[in-house]
């Protein structure tokens, strides 16, 4: 079994130099203990699940001793926050420890969130709190299990170090993994500070490391933008299809790799409400669920602006026109699968929109609807689901059309269709009230609920007998929890 001290670090981003990041030593937290660890994330580094019991893991994540081979750096970047440019950003509470190469040749950034003050902390203390660390851990691993591209979370470490937010809380750290931590905001930082040579160096670095196919294109920089756009469209299609609301889609929270990244006040839809706002600091609803696609387009235009020293503006505008068609095509295919279709018909989009309108009008639970649609033969499932709708005439019309649509699939094996639907429609979804209950237990020192919740959410499509309580409809109080950016 590989030991933590034997990880193969190769810190290429650190070698870019002090223009791009600053060397910082993690500040230790007091009396650290492991809250939860992900066996799946450990495996990405060729580590066995038993490594979670190694005291050295807590020591490294608590900043109590240096990780052999790591070169902790705070990355420099800026970004647009709620539509306004902020030049004073950067890693204010987290450090890129380094890059590890696993046995498959894959590179994984190790990023320690809550590592203490950095040159970019501004007025902050550089710490993360336990509740936000648990929320990111649970969401990262759950999104991965759902098939949604995301950063990963290896473990959460709690402590007795006090920190002040709205009230006194306890500091924690999160060890995050991602193929890269480069954000849209990295490019904006060098563009708006007019460091164009550094901008070129960053472009060459990310293309060489992550988009090598672009080097064969006539304009590698535009090709890079196209790849980022394509990945972002694919990501947004999955967010919208599975009812995920990020909550704070600032450009500094947008990954060049099209992965879910730096999410704090996130939520999955309970009742279907396209105008849902999960971040109670978002007074204008800029990052509401139904605004995520246009915001992603806006953020891509901000990235494109940062590339204008090297890419023709008209070419970038031409690329941006591809975003919505790419998103719509990917989203439509995902929704077809969720409804059990294997073929495509021209009016499928309209069919799906009619369903969503009916769900909105009746406040139907978004995730449970699709799961229950595959629980029984189609006609029986629709009879049960009819009970959840207010507009019965509208639902009956849609249900009749849906049965006719399924009949045109010419699929004789009903069981195969239902199994296929269960493979894409989760029984278990990370609801805010479940996360809150686990967090409250953890704050009392009981980590078993968060560990059990993580285990259940890591297999969201499986029945998991005995765990049905995690699949229940949320209580009314659980639908209205306010989540803030405070972390």
From Swiss-Prot:
Binding-site residues, ATP: 90, 92-93, 113, 125-126, 176, 183, 262
An MF annotation (GO) of this entry: AMPylase activity
Cofactor dependency: Mg(2+); Mn(2+)
Active-site residue list: 252 (proton acceptor)
Superkingdom of source: Bacteria
One Pfam family from the record: SelO
UniProt: Mg(2+) binding residues: 253, 262
InterPro entries, A to Z: SelO
Keyword Iron-sulfur recorded: no
EC assignment: 2.7.7.-, 2.7.7.108
Catalytic activity: L-seryl-[protein] + ATP = 3-O-(5'-adenylyl)-L-seryl-[protein] + diphosphate; L-threonyl-[protein] + ATP = 3-O-(5'-adenylyl)-L-threonyl-[protein] + diphosphate; L-tyrosyl-[protein] + ATP = O-(5'-adenylyl)-L-tyrosyl-[protein] + diphosphate; L-histidyl-[protein] + UTP = N(tele)-(5'-uridylyl)-L-histidyl-[protein] + diphosphate
Entry keyword set: ATP-binding, Magnesium, Manganese, Metal-binding, Nucleotide-binding, Nucleotidyltransferase, Transferase
Function: Nucleotidyltransferase involved in the post-translational modification of proteins. It can catalyze the addition of adenosine monophosphate (AMP) or uridine monophosphate (UMP) to a protein, resulting in modifications known as AMPylation and UMPylation.
Family recorded in the similarity comment: Belongs to the SELO family.
Protein name (record): Protein nucleotidyltransferase YdiU
Organism: Azotobacter vinelandii (strain DJ / ATCC BAA-1303)
């Amino acid at each position: 079994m590989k030991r933590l001290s034997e990880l193969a670090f190769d810190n290429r981003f650190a070698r870019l130099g002090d223009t791009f990041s600053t060397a910082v030593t993690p500040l230790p937290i007091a009396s650290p203990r492991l809250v939860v660890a992900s066996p799946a994330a450990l495996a990405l580094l060729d580590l066995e699940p038993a490594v979670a019991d190694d005291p050295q893991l807590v020591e490294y994540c608590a900043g109590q001793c240096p990780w052999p081979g790591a070169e902790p750096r705070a990355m420099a970047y800026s970004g647009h926050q709620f539509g306004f440019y902020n030049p004073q950003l950067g890693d204010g509470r987290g450090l890129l420890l380094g890059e590890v190469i696993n046995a498959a040749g894959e590179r994984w950034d190790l990023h320690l969130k809550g590592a203490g003050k950095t040159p970019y902390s501004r007025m902050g203390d550089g710490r993360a709190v336990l509740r936000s660390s648990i929320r990111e851990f649970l969401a990262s691993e759950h999104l991965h299990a759902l098939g949604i591209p995301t950063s990963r979370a290896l473990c959460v470490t709690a402590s007795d170090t006090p920190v002040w937010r709205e009230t006194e809380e306890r500091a924690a750290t999160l060890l995050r993994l991602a193929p890269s931590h480069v954000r849209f905001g990295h490019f904006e930082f060098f563009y708006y500070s007019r460091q164009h040579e550094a901008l070129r160096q960053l472009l060459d670095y990310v293309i060489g490391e992550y988009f090598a196919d672009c080097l064969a294109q006539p304009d590698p920089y535009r090709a890079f933008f196209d790849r980022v756009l394509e990945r972002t469209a694919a990501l947004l299609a999955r967010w919208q299809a599975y009812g995920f609301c990020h909550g704070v889609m600032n450009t500094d929270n947008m990954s060049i790799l099209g992965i879910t990244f730096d999410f704090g006040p996130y939520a999955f839809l309970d009742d279907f409400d396209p105008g849902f706002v999960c971040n109670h600091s978002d007074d204008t609803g800029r990052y509401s669920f139904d605004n995520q696609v246009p915001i992603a387009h806006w953020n891509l235009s901000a990235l494109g602006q940062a590339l204008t020293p090297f890419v023709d503006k008209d070419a970038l505008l031409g690329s941006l026109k591809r975003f919505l068609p790419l998103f719509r095509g990917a989203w439509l295919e995902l929704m077809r699968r969720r409804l059990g279709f294997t073929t495509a018909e021209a009016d499928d989009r309209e069919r799906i929109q009619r369903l969503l309108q009916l769900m909105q009008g009746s406040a139907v639970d978004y995730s449970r609807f699709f799961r229950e649609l595959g629980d029984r033969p189609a006609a029986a499932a629709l009879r049960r689901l009819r009970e959840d709708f207010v507009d019965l005439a509208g639902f009956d019309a849609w249900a009749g059309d849906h049965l006719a649509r399924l009949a045109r699939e010419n699929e004789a094996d009903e069981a195969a269709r239902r199994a296929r639907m269960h493979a894409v429609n989760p029984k278990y979804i990370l609801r805010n009230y479940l996360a809150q209950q686990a967090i409250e237990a953890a704050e009392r020192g009981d980590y078993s609920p968060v560990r059990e919740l993580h285990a259940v959410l890591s297999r969201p499509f499986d029945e998991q007998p005995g765990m049905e309580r995690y699949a229940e409809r949320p209580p009314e109080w659980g639908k209205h929890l306010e989540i803030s950016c405070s972390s």
